[in-house]
Amino acid sequence: MAQEEEKDAGISKYISTTDEIIIGCKCWVEKDGEQRLAEILSINNRRQPPKFYVHYEDFNKRLDEWILASRINIEREVTFPKPRDPDEKKKKKQKKSATPQATDGETLESADIMDLENLNVQGLRDEGISRDDEIKKLRTSGSMTQNPHEVSRVRNLSKIIMGKHEIEPWYFSPYPIELTDEDVVYIDDFSLQYFGSKKQYARYRQKCTLRHPPGNEIYRDDYVSFFEIDGRKQRTWCRNLCLLSKLFLDHKTLYYDVDPFLFYCMTQRDELGHHLVGYFSKEKESADGYNVACILTLPQYQRMGYGRLLIEFSYELSKKENKVGSPEKPLSDLGLLSYRAYWSDTLIKLLVENGTEITIDEISSMTSLTTTDILHTAKALNILRYYKGQHILYLNEDVLLRYEKLIAKKRRSIDPEKLIWKPPIFTASQLRFAW
């Protein structure tokens, strides 16, 4: 048993130089003044000095980074990956054919992930689907396609400059390989075109006349504007947007498959033009009733309330369509937190201000939230009770206190009167996306 554990853990030994380190090694790395255990995911020897791409154990993937050898502590043991057993692949194949129904979805990792679909509400069927199983059930095109390759674990751009903002990417994005050796990649604020040198970018900027997303402006107030862009009509711009967003979204998006989507881009105006703040995409025809496919606030604008405005705007569109909607699952960790906060505040505000008896279906009709999202939110707020075969909601002191704080905050919100938009109608030929 002890030998098995040692084999699974790998082989630990001391090394004399970092030249002995290979991909898959686990070693101690200096991070923020502390020694942290990290796994080597990639090694770049194309330039000197060599760099190592590391993932810190028990830390979010977005903190992965390229480091120099000087940060690796070779005075402590390095764990090398266990040697591959040539018969292991054969055994796995035999095991797989013997048990075709077995799945590897229910892992310890998936159990730790907060998933909306696993929230049990009394009286509702709890399917108990893990995040991995849920991903397998989703369609394999559009925004939900997973990148199974090992290369997707390695962030390929070190830094981007977008307008006046310098940003460190979080994840891999399939930009052209020639950009991956550049210390900085320049991304145009308006066209989202990318460049490997400042000179190229400056020359392009002199010629480019675009000053806003290439679509129809459907909303404007004194704070933000929204543009609607058809992925089929503006393929290059939308692909550039997806490449950019993939740097900050780990779980979905296929950059070249933009035809089936409409993109709703939120911008801020100044004397130079409309600067992209965030966006959400939406399927032209969603069989599952999703009103959002991907949603992102760019990192330089996060924690300023823009994400909430994006979510609120998506529901305003659903109200105009006379539909209920929900975001495509699984949500990212930050997306899930934002949606839960929006659903909670919307439900509390409606219940307190309505003051009369109201059904869950009526709440759904007024807010465009699905009944499932309403029930899950009510359960999380601890205001849901199952009484005589039906769900009832009641307001407790915590909810009333939260309502007072909500009103005191005076958040910016979307003004429905300023939304100039009719739900687009597409013919069968327009919904064919073979190209």
UniProtKB/Swiss-Prot annotation:
Annotated ranges, domain MYST-type HAT: 152-423
Catalysed reaction, written as an equation: L-lysyl-[histone] + acetyl-CoA = N(6)-acetyl-L-lysyl-[histone] + CoA + H(+); L-lysyl-[protein] + acetyl-CoA = N(6)-acetyl-L-lysyl-[protein] + CoA + H(+); 2-hydroxyisobutanoyl-CoA + L-lysyl-[protein] = N(6)-(2-hydroxyisobutanoyl)-L-lysyl-[protein] + CoA + H(+); (2E)-butenoyl-CoA + L-lysyl-[protein] = N(6)-(2E)-butenoyl-L-lysyl-[protein] + CoA + H(+)
Keyword annotations of the record: Acetylation, Activator, Chromatin regulator, Chromosome, DNA damage, DNA repair, Nucleus, Transcription, Transcription regulation, Transferase
Domain Tudor-knot: 22-73
Compartment(s) of residence: Nucleus; Chromosome
Keyword Cell inner membrane part of the UniProt annotation: no
PTM sites of type N6-acetyllysine: K252
Region (Disordered): 78-108
GO MF term list: chromatin binding; histone acetyltransferase activity; histone crotonyltransferase activity; histone H4 acetyltransferase activity; peptide 2-hydroxyisobutyryltransferase activity; transcription coregulator activity
Root EC class: transferase
Basic and acidic residues bias: start-end ranges: 78-89
Motif (ESA1-RPD3 motif): 235-256
Residues annotated as site: Important for catalytic activity: C294
One of the protein's GO biological processes: regulation of cell cycle
Domain of life according to the entry: Eukaryota
Positions of acetyl-CoA binding: A293, C294, I295, L296, T297, Q302, R303, M304, G305, Y306, G307, R308, S332
PTM field: Autoacetylation at Lys-252 is required for proper function.
EC id: 2.3.1.48, 2.3.1.-
Translocase as UniProt keyword: no
GO cellular component labels: chromatin; NuA4 histone acetyltransferase complex; nucleosome; nucleus; piccolo histone acetyltransferase complex
Active site residues per record: E328 (proton donor/acceptor)
Free-text domain note: The ESA1-RPD3 motif is common to ESA1 and RPD3 and is required for ESA1 histone acetyl-transferase (HAT) activity and RPD3 histone deacetylase (HDAC) activity.
Subunit-structure text: Component of the NuA4 histone acetyltransferase complex. Interacts with arp4.
UniProt function note: Catalytic component of the NuA4 histone acetyltransferase (HAT) complex which is involved in epigenetic transcriptional activation of selected genes principally by acetylation of nucleosomal histones H4, H3, H2B, H2A and H2A variant H2A.Z. Acetylates histone H4 to form H4K5ac, H4K8ac, H4K12ac and H4K16ac, histone H3 to form H3K14ac, and histone H2A to form H2AK4ac and H2AK7ac. The NuA4 complex is involved in the DNA damage response and is required for chromosome segregation. The NuA4 complex plays a direct role in repair of DNA double-strand breaks (DSBs) through homologous recombination.
Family: Belongs to the MYST (SAS/MOZ) family.
Stated name of the protein: Histone acetyltransferase ESA1
Source organism (scientific name): Eremothecium gossypii (strain ATCC 10895 / CBS 109.51 / FGSC 9923 / NRRL Y-1056) (Yeast)
Lineage of the organism: Eukaryota, Fungi, Dikarya, Ascomycota, Saccharomycotina
Gene, per the UniProt record: ESA1
